[in-house]
């Protein structure tokens, strides 16, 4: 008679995570002939970084970056502070110069799903992501020039256009494995001519 009650939130599994488990994993095993299921590349984390160099002059700018990153990622970002003082940039040690959020687990899957299906198609004159920005170990980093491509950001309420860097960290050993994983997840890479 003991019955476990499941909350509705515990049943919801991100769409991309389900796709990875159901079809992408088996496709990668066939393509790269893995002997062990643990060799299959998987996502570790996604880091979204927003550098705000002008925050050295105006400290209010960092609040806008934190607000935007919170809306985009769904979690409160860490404020990045200057490690060294640099006189030419009028920068002192400990001054806020940016913000970053590290996404793992279901938040990471949800963010990538929104990025690939909603945000990237909204970029003007978008021809695909460059396939050359892998770091040699299967991790991929790319930059976005403005934050308004995310539908969580209200275009009328932004104080200034801010770009961001997004790094996708995988367990892939080579760039080819990482590229195959991200392509299967729906990343629109340019076809190299």
UniProtKB/Swiss-Prot annotation:
Keywords: Ribonucleoprotein, Ribosomal protein, RNA-binding, rRNA-binding, tRNA-binding. InterPro entries: Ribosomal_uL5, Ribosomal_uL5_bac-type, Ribosomal_uL5_C, Ribosomal_uL5_dom_sf, Ribosomal_uL5_N. Transmembrane segments: none annotated. GO terms for biological process: translation. One of its GO terms (molecular function) is tRNA binding. The keyword tRNA-binding applies. This is one of the proteins that bind and probably mediate the attachment of the 5S RNA into the large ribosomal subunit, where it forms part of the central protuberance. In the 70S ribosome it contacts protein S13 of the 30S subunit (bridge B1b), connecting the 2 subunits; this bridge is implicated in subunit movement. Contacts the P site tRNA; the 5S rRNA and some of its associated proteins might help stabilize positioning of ribosome-bound tRNAs. Part of the 50S ribosomal subunit; part of the 5S rRNA/L5/L18/L25 subcomplex. Contacts the 5S rRNA and the P site tRNA. Forms a bridge to the 30S subunit in the 70S ribosome. NCBIfam families: PRK00010.1. This is Large ribosomal subunit protein uL5. It comes from Arthrobacter sp. (strain FB24). The gene is rplE.
